[in-house]
Amino acid sequence: VPVLALLGVVGDVVRRGSFRVTAGALYAISALLILLVGTVAAAVGSFPTFETAGTIFDLGVSHAVVLASLVASLGGIHWWSTKIGRQQANEAMGRVAPLLLLVGSLAVVLADVISGLFGEGAELNADWTGGMEAMNWVAVLGTAIVALGLLTSLGAVLPALKAGTDVPADPWEGQTLEWLAPSPPPLGNFEAELAPVTSAEPLADLRQEK
């Protein structure tokens, strides 16, 4: 239910026309899709009709949760790169990375889930009968794509580690107060006195006033 609620929020943002295709957005959507696949798989596995206990099916669901968390974390690092370092992350590489991670993660998760439905034992189970050998190769390919996505993601944030000129305080047109602070921030975080905060989106309020 929480996953569906988050997808509903994303859909509402797109519907209202305030959605921007940025690397951060692609990371977030990719993480949500991976988590959604894992959630659906877990729901399917709960039916007694599918005998998934002791198979690699459960590992596929676990992979979905771990990979979704990883993708979301990398997206956060990319999004806040100007607050973490002194340069903005590479946006072009940042848009490619989540797509690679999404494709690779889905290959790994779906391969494990499908193979588990066909009876392949879990990694710690001595019984390796059943399953689909082709799905094992799909999982290997998916793992390689995930590794490539990780390297691309790390390459995208390398500029944040370099010293350079001050970056814009708000490169994303953010809505919360951290985007009002310059990077790096002065003593006290803000250069001027803050206007009263009257909503959860104070920067959006300031733009409307202008």
Each model region followed by its residue ranges:
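Hydrophobic cores of alpha-helical transmembrane segments in multi-pass integral membrane proteins
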Residues: 1-13, 25-48, 58-210
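Juxtamembrane membrane-water interface segments that cap and precede transmembrane helices
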Residues: 53-56
